[in-house]
From Swiss-Prot:
Domain of life according to the entry: Eukaryota
Gene: CD209
Positions occupied by motif Endocytosis signal: 14-15, 16-18, 31-34
Annotated source species: Pan troglodytes (Chimpanzee)
SMART domains assigned to the protein according to its UniProt record, in alphabetical order: CLECT (SM00034)
Cell compartment(s), UniProt: Membrane
Listed transmembrane segments: 38-58
Disulfide-linked positions: 279-290, 307-400, 379-392
Name of this chain's protein: CD209 antigen
Lineage: Eukaryota, Metazoa, Chordata, Craniata, Vertebrata
Binding-site list for Ca(2+): 370, 372, 374, 377, 388-389
UniProt domain C-type lectin: residue ranges: 286-401
Pfam families documented for this protein: Lectin_C (PF00059)
Length: 427
């Protein structure tokens, strides 16, 4: 009985295993089910390990990609710094300044993403070199200081005597030398010339500008008188005055000596006044006539009256040489100056104050487009480098003209004082 039961139990065990295989290792109750599940544990562990390893490989594969991106970004930063260095080397051009600004903008964006300390150090070195290069440019304060120095220099140069005035003084002394050069003794001529040279140097050191101008006027008047010296006795008298002047000039440093020089010049003026003068003081001699250039302004009719009061007339131009002389005097002072020409009697017919008509050859002296009679312009003036017509009631400077005096060679004539001629009264 027992023998028949054992084969039957074996058959039941085999049947149970087949059922388990058909169900895919499905858990069932009983001891056999638990043993089957425990038998497949290593396979589950291997599956979990494979999943974890795959995740790690995916993460590792991402690291080289980010590193390569960082390296490429560092290369871009280095290239930008190289371009910036080259741009600083050519800093003088405005386009390069703009390029540097762009490079700095890019540098700012790149520095914000710097990952490695070594790149930061390299950028710091480049910035240090850039600072050194920029440091060689002139500082704004230095530029301002240079500008201030130039301003002071301009102001100092502005206080120097005008070149034209210096040239004029030199020309006056040259003419005076030529006049004195006609003295009989050659040795005396040389001595006088040397004295005038010393006098010129001494006058250049006088501190007071007003005193210099006064001495310049005295020398101008002396030139006018000496230029027409006919008598040996008068030449000797002037030579004596220059000798006295020499003694004063020789000790110029003291202020008292400067005053002494001024007194000597005053005495010299008094001596010259005893000579024959073709023109009064403050009048200018030219080709046998004397001319007075006013320092005040009047209208055209009052200018005629002012000239008549001193025995002259508002200037009438008779030659091209006279026109050139008067035009130069007017343009040099940059003044609008009346002349004795108008078309008051008949519009378009120009006449001088002495009644003579304007010659056709003189029409060339009108400025372009003149006379145009805009607003009843009937009187002529010196304007710029030519003539212009303007309203007669306007106040302007004026020029008087009269014939120069004739000098006799009689000694008594030279010893007698020249008649005093008043200047036109101020307006």
């Amino acid at each position: 009985m027992s023998d028949s039961k054992e084969p039957r139990l074996q058959q039941l065990g085999l049947l149970e295993e087949e059922q388990l295989r058909g169900l895919g290792f499905r858990q069932t109750r009983g001891y056999k089910s638990l043993a089957g599940c425990l038998g497949h544990g290593p396979l589950v562990l291997q599956l979990l390990s494979f999943t974890l390893l795959a995740g790690l490989l995916v993460q590792v594969s991402k690291v080289p990609s980010s590193i390569s991106q960082e390296e490429s970004r560092q290369d871009v930063i280095y290239q930008n710094l190289t371009q910036l260095k080259a741009a600083v080397g050519e800093l003088s051009e405005k386009s390069k300044l703009q390029e540097i600004y762009q490079e700095l903008t890019q540098l700012k964006a790149a520095v914000g993403e710097l990952p490695e300390k070594s790149k930061q150090q390299e950028i710091y070195q480049e910035l240090t070199r850039l600072k050194a290069a920029v440091g060689e440019l002139p500082e704004k304060s230095k530029m301002q200081e240079i500008y201030q120095e130039l301003t002071r220099l301009k102001a100092a140069v502005g206080e120097l005597p005008e070149k034209s005035k210096m040239q004029e003084i030199y020309q006056e002394l040259t003419r005076l030398k030529a006049a004195v050069g006609e003295l009989p003794e050659k040795s005396k001529q040389q001595e006088i010339y040397q004295e005038l040279t010393r006098l010129k140097a001494a006058v250049g050191e006088l501190p007071e500008k007003s005193k210099q101008q006064e001495i310049y006027q005295e020398l101008t008047q002396l030139k006018a008188a000496v230029g027409e010296l006919p008598e040996k006795s008068k030449q000797q008298e002037i030579y004596q005055e220059l000798t006295r002047l020499k003694a004063a000039v020789g000790e110029l440093p003291e202020k008292s000596k400067q005053q002494e020089i001024y007194q000597e010049l005053t005495q010299l003026k008094a001596a010259v006044e005893r000579l024959c003068r073709r023109c009064p003081w403050e009048w200018t001699f030219f080709q046998g006539n004397c001319y007075f250039m006013s320092n005040s302004q009047r209208n055209w009719h009052d200018s005629i009256t002012a000239c008549k009061e001193v025995g002259a007339q508002l200037v009438v131009i008779k030659s091209a040489e006279e026109q050139n002389f008067l035009q130069l005097q007017s343009s040099r002072s940059n003044r609008f100056t009346w002349m004795g020409l108008s078309d008051l009697n008949e519009e378009g017919t120009w006449q001088w104050v002495d009644g003579s008509p304007l010659l056709p050859s003189f029409n060339q002296y009108w400025n372009r487009g003149e006379p145009n009679n805009v607003g009843e312009e009937d009187c002529a003036e010196f304007s710029g480098n030519g003539w212009n017509d303007d309203k007669c009631n306007l106040a302007k400077f004026w020029i008087c003209k009269k014939s120069a005096a004739s000098c006799s060679r009689d000694e008594e004539q030279f010893l007698s004082p020249a008649p005093a001629t008043p200047n036109p009264p101020p307006a």
